[in-house]
Amino acid sequence: MMDGRLLEHPHAQFGGSLGGVVGFPYPLGHHHVYELAGHQLQSAAAAASVPFSIDGLLGGSCAAAASVVNPTPLLPAACGVGGDGQPFKLSDSGDPDKESPGCKRRRTRTNFTGWQLEELEKAFNESHYPDVFMREALALRLDLVESRVQVWFQNRRAKWRKKENTKKGPGRPAHNSHPTTCSGEPMDPEEIARKELEKMEKKKRKHEKKLLKSQGRHLHSPGGLSLHSAPSSDSDSGGGGLSPEPPEPPPPAAKGPGAHASGAAGTAPAPPGEPPAPGTCDPAFYPSQRSGAGPQPRPGRPADKDAASCGPGAAVAAVERGAAGLPKASPFSVESLLSDSPPRRKAASNAAAAAAAGLDFAPGLPCAPRTLIGKGHFLLYPITQPLGFLVPQAALKGGAGLEPAPKDAPPAPAVPPAPPAQASFGAFSGPGGAPDSAFARRSPDAVASPGAPAPAPAPFRDLASAAATEGGGGDCADAGTAGPAPPPPAPSPRPGPRPPSPAEEPATCGVPEPGAAAGPSPPEGEELDMD
């Protein structure tokens, strides 16, 4: 304890009590004490000046402490009696366990030689827990410190326990290269194959579950439901007869007699209070409702595309296209809205039943499943006819008295298919692209009843067939540009006025007929104002 305190204050050891501490036999005066202290410091500095000794690396305090603790070499070295001038050397510096308690030296890792390891292994095989006497004997024989022998035995016992628990030899490969049981025994090949099969099945089930989840998320997402745009409000407003079509030429099934009759009979406009369905018809159709000329065809678009994309006849064309097996084009038509109702029927039988019942939609056509929101309108209030049939009945109750042809009547097979431009809503375009007023002049109801917003459907069809016969002459501007002339028409079985014969009409389209209009005919090139 005393020398520890002296090491903490190295200059305090050279005070007046130095003689008592060292055990010096003679009383020392102040002069001798200072002289002794000077020699002690010089010797410590000399010991520290040796560049590669342990004491020089650790500082001179340990050397000074060792010289103070060891009283035997004190007088010859301190007083210079020996005259050799050799610095002090720690007597037990080779033993790290016997170092002075004040100096904390870091222990380096002990490198055992092969011979030392062999002897230690032999001793370990004899006894895993050697006593202190056996450890001391090993340390003396192997030129080691007893503490290092003790630590080696501790580490060797831990390694042995680990090897016994896992049966893992020193040269064994990685733990997962050869499958073993929990006790370390090798597994049977059948068990290995069974485990591999279970792992593959588990991975396959996980992959299938992930695929199903991604498909369900894709079908219920808004991007998976509507391919072109957001769903329209036709399901809420009841306008199920109007199904939008993309701008592509109609298939041959849409140009049949039934499609022509339905398109001609449904030419009445929608009610004024109902907004147009998005993407259904040309936007110019709605401002021109007040004129009897109808919509103007688009300048850069063929007239048959306008005819195919407007009117309830397009819905029948869509049903026929679905019955023919063609891909469904419209994502928010009535077929797609009503597709995933619980009874799933075949598409062909649905289309035939819908055509026979006069429906413009087939409720069971297959498409992407939709949620059940908004279906109650169609299930509770089925639409039995296109929306265009309701308007002529309300508008012509005091007019010409012509009732439209019933929807349930079979289509007339004798009526030839008119060119697509004549089956459209629009007027026949004149030479300058303006609507021709001869179309309005040939319709008796359009001039006789100015209050009606649109002419009756039946004269439209008869007029179209009559115009088709005149178009064969080649001198009518609009019929000549529309398409080739069809064969001459047969008498129509549907109710309506008798179509004017070619003998009663002049061959040219520009001259008005004498008795066709009840009122004065407007001049050429002007639209008829129906307001």
UniProtKB/Swiss-Prot annotation:
The keyword Transcription applies. It holds the Pfam family Homeodomain. Residues 224-236, 255-268, 421-438, 504-519 have a biased composition (Low complexity). Transmembrane segments: none annotated. Residues 87-107, 161-312, 324-344, 401-531 are annotated as: Disordered. One of its GO terms (cellular component) is nucleus. Its main location: nucleus. Residues 191-201 have a biased composition (Basic and acidic residues). InterPro entries: HD, Homeobox_CS, Homeodomain-like_sf. Residues 105-164 bind DNA. Residues 202-220 have a biased composition (Basic residues). Residues 244-254, 269-278, 407-420, 484-503 have a biased composition (Pro residues). One of its GO terms (molecular function) is DNA-binding transcription factor activity, RNA polymerase II-specific. It is found in: Nucleus. Keywords: Developmental protein, Differentiation, DNA-binding, Homeobox, Neurogenesis, Nucleus, Transcription, Transcription regulation. GO terms for biological process: cartilage condensation; common myeloid progenitor cell proliferation; dorsal spinal cord development; olfactory bulb interneuron differentiation; pattern specification process; regulation of cell differentiation; regulation of gene expression. It comes from the Eukaryota. Transcription factor involved in somitogenesis and neurogenesis. Required for the maintenance and differentiation of particular elements of the axial skeleton. May act upstream of PAX9. Plays a role in controlling the development of connections of hypothalamic neurons to pituitary elements, allowing central neurons to reach the peripheral blood circulation and to deliver hormones for control of peripheral functions. Belongs to the paired homeobox family. Unc-4 subfamily. This is Homeobox protein unc-4 homolog. It comes from Homo sapiens.
